[in-house]
Every structure is written in C-alpha cells, then in structure tokens.
C-alpha cells in the first residue's frame, strides 16, 4: 500500500474522504445483507469513520484496520474512549474498547479473524489497479463461509482523472469476486451539476454491491 501517501494525508489533516456523519449508503443498504446482531463485522481501511459507531450499535463485534495511527487514536479520543492498546510488533498495534477492535498498521499483515459481514466503502477504491487483486484476495480470506460484503465503488474514465479514489468498473468487480454471488444494488449516475462533471469528467457513477460467499 502507498503508506507514505496516506500517512501524509492524515498528518496534514487532508481527509476529504472522511465523512462527518454516517454514510447514507450504509444506513440504506446494510439491511440487504440480512445482518444479525451476533454476526461479526470487518471494516477495512476504516479511518476514524462514524460508520463504525453505527455498526457497533447493531453488532457485538466490529473490527477495523487502519494504516494511520493518527486516525485510530483520533477515533477513540474524539469519543472519549480509553482503549486497551497492545503492541503486536514494531509496526502493528491493537486497540480494543467494548465492541471495537481496531488494528493500526498494514492491512495485509494484520491478524484479522474471518468475519460474517464486511463493509468496504473507501478501501478498494483507495488502491491503484495493481494492488486491488491482492487486496481482494486477502479480503475474501477474511470472510466466513456464508458471509456477505457491502461494497461501494466508483465508475468513471480513469484517463480523465487521477485517483484516489480510483475507478473500479463493473467488469473488474465481477472479476475480483469471481465465484461469489454478485448483486448490484444501486448505480447512481452523476448529473450535470455534480462537482466531478463540472470539473470535466464525461461520466461519474457510484455503485453499491452485495457480494455473497
């Protein structure tokens, strides 16, 4: 992963990707996974997202992994939580508080147990194409048999704008999750007033997927 790029974003507080409230896609489409309270949830590249709080209100165990130590510490500090911190290695820390378990370090090496449910809003689209296959292989290994993924992707002409966030078109989604049941829940096409279209993109769409193991 491009560690330095994201570390600099958090260090300089250039975090336009961070939403100050729960993502409406999560609240609208989480029920499509038919989630149960005792099912475990994994959120890759979670940042300090408010989505974690929403999920913890509905599940007993929410696990995240985030490269930036700044983001992980901010998540707990902003909520006045005092987590138990375990140093797992020189580059990996484990933060635990009530329903929350968050690893601070590399997604590819964090020892995360397979979960029933996965929520990926900003992880896959944060990675360049050459990293997405390896990322997805790891993600699939962290999903239990019968598990479900709620995935959010973007679709635009990558030649017209440099990521991140990157474009992950339908054909790539279907290739990455080949062998799994893939259902597109939504495709939201940007209109002429959308900031991305005003900046010159010929098209820009947000897509929501239900992926079942």
Swiss-Prot record:
A cellular-component GO term for this protein: cytoplasm
EC numbers for this chain: 2.1.1.67
Q: Name one Pfam family in it.
A: TPMT
The record lists the catalysed reaction(s) as: S-adenosyl-L-methionine + a thiopurine = S-adenosyl-L-homocysteine + a thiopurine S-methylether
Q: What is its main location?
A: cytoplasm
Keyword check for Transferase: yes
Q: Name one GO molecular function term.
A: thiopurine S-methyltransferase activity
Q: Which UniProt keywords apply?
A: Cytoplasm, Methyltransferase, S-adenosyl-L-methionine, Transferase
Where S-adenosyl-L-methionine binds, per the record, is at 10, 45, 66, 121
Q: Name one GO biological process term.
A: methylation
Q: Which SUPFAM superfamilies match?
A: S-adenosyl-L-methionine-dependent methyltransferases (SSF53335)
What family classification does the UniProt entry report for this protein? Belongs to the class I-like SAM-binding methyltransferase superfamily. TPMT family.
Q: What is this protein called?
A: Thiopurine S-methyltransferase
């Amino acid at each position: 992963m491009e560690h330095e790029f994201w570390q600099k974003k958090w260090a300089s507080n250039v975090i336009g990707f961070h939403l100050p409230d729960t993502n409406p896609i999560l609240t609208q489409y989480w029920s499509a996974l038919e989630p149960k309270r005792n099912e475990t949830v994994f959120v890759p590249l979670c940042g300090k997202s408010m989505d974690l709080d929403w999920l913890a209100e509905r599940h007993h165990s929410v696990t995240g992994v985030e490269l930036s130590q700044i983001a992980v510490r901010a998540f707990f500090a902003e909520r006045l939580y005092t987590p138990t911190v375990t140093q797992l290695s020189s580059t990996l820390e484990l933060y635990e508080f009530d329903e929350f378990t968050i690893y601070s370090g590399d997604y590819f090496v964090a020892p995360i147990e397979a979960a029933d449910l996965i929520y990926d809003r900003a992880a896959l689209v944060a990675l360049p194409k050459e990293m997405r296959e390896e990322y997805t292989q790891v993600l699939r290994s962290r999903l239990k048999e019968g598990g479900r993924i709620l995935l959010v992707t973007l679709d635009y002409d990558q030649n017209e704008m440099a990521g991140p966030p990157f474009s992950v078109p339908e054909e790539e989604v279907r290739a990455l999750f080949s062998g799994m049941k893939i259902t597109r829940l939504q495709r939201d096409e940007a209109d002429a007033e959308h900031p991305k279209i005003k900046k010159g993109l010929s098209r820009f769409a947000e897509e929501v997927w239900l992926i079942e193991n």
